[in-house]
C-alpha cells in the first residue's frame, strides 16, 4: 500500500479531560485508488488528513507513506517525506495573487530545486492535464473558482507525489463544477497511479471514487453514508 495508517489514535488535552480526535483508525490506499472520507464537521476528517500528511504525529499507531514508516521519524525527516512523496490540495486554493497559473507551479519547483527547464515543461504538462491549456498566463482574479481549484490540484502534483490528499475540493464550487473537479481527480489518480484520499461533506460528488468511508466521532467505517449530514 502506498498509504497505510494502522491503529491510529489521536488525543488532545482539554482542561482536565482528554479529547479523542481519532479512535483506532485504520486506512490503506493502494496506487491508482481514489478513496473518499465523508462525515459531519468535527467527526475527525481534518485530523485524519493531517496525520496522513505527516503534519501532526498521532498519539499512537503507525503511518506508512510510500513504503516509509514515518511515525518515529524526526520532524526534518517527515518534512522530506512529505515534500518528496505527498501532494496536498488544501480546501482554499491560496494562490499567490500576483502570479500566473504557470508561475504558481514553478514556485513549488523552485523550492524543491532541480532544473528550471524541466520544471517549466512539467508545469505546462500539468496545466494541460487539468484542462487549463491556454490559461497559463492568467492570474487568480482572472479565473473562475473551478479554474483556481484546478491550478491548486496541478500545483500539488508538481513534485510527482505518490500520495495525493485532498481537503474539501468542492466546498466553494457549485454542483456542476464540483463534479468536474472530482472527476478530474479520479482521472489523475488513475493516470498517475496515485493513492488519493479526499475528505468531503459533499455526498453528491462521490460517483467517481473507488471507495467511500464514513467518519463519525473519530471512527472510520466503510459503506453506509446515511445520516452523515444529520449527524452534524
Can you say where each PLM-predicted feature lies in the sequence?
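ABC family nucleotide-binding domain
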Residues: 2-3, 8-191, 196-216
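Conserved beta-strand-loop-alpha-helix hinge in the C-terminal portion
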Residues: 219-232
Amino acid at each position: 500500500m502506498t498509504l497505510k495508517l494502522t491503529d491510529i489514535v489521536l488525543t488532545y488535552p482539554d482542561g482536565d479531560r482528554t479529547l479523542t480526535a481519532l479512535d483506532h483508525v485504520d486506512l490503506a490506499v493502494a496506487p491508482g485508488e481514489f478513496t473518499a472520507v465523508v462525515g459531519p464537521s468535527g467527526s475527525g476528517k481534518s485530523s485524519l488528513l493531517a496525520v496522513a500528511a505527516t503534519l501532526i504525529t498521532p498519539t499512537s499507531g503507525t503511518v506508512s507513506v510510500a513504503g516509509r514508516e514515518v511515525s518515529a521519524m524526526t520532524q526534518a525527516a517527515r518534512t522530506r517525506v512529505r515534500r518528496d512523496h505527498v501532494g496536498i490540495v488544501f480546501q482554499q486554493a491560496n494562490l499567490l495573487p500576483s502570479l500566473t497559473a504557470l508561475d504558481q507551479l514553478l514556485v513549488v519547483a523552485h523550492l524543491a530545486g532541480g532544473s528550471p527547464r524541466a520544471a517549466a515543461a512539467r508545469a505546462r504538462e500539468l496545466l494541460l492535464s487539468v484542462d487549463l491549456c491556454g490559461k497559463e498566463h492568467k492570474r487568480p482574479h482572472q479565473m473562475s473558482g473551478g479554474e483556481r481549484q484546478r491550478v491548486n490540484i496541478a500545483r500539488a502534483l508538481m513534485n510527482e507525489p505518490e500520495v495525493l490528499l485532498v481537503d474539501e475540493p468542492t466546498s466553494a464550487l457549485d454542483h456542476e463544477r464540483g463534479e468536474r473537479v472530482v472527476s478530474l481527480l479520479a482521472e489523475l489518480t488513475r493516470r498517475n497511479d496515485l493513492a488519493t484520499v479526499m475528505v468531503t461533506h459533499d455526498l453528491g460528488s462521490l460517483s467517481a471514487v473507488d471507495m467511500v468511508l464514513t467518519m463519525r466521532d473519530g471512527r472510520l467505517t466503510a459503506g453506509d453514508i446515511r445520516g452523515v449530514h444529520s449527524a452534524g
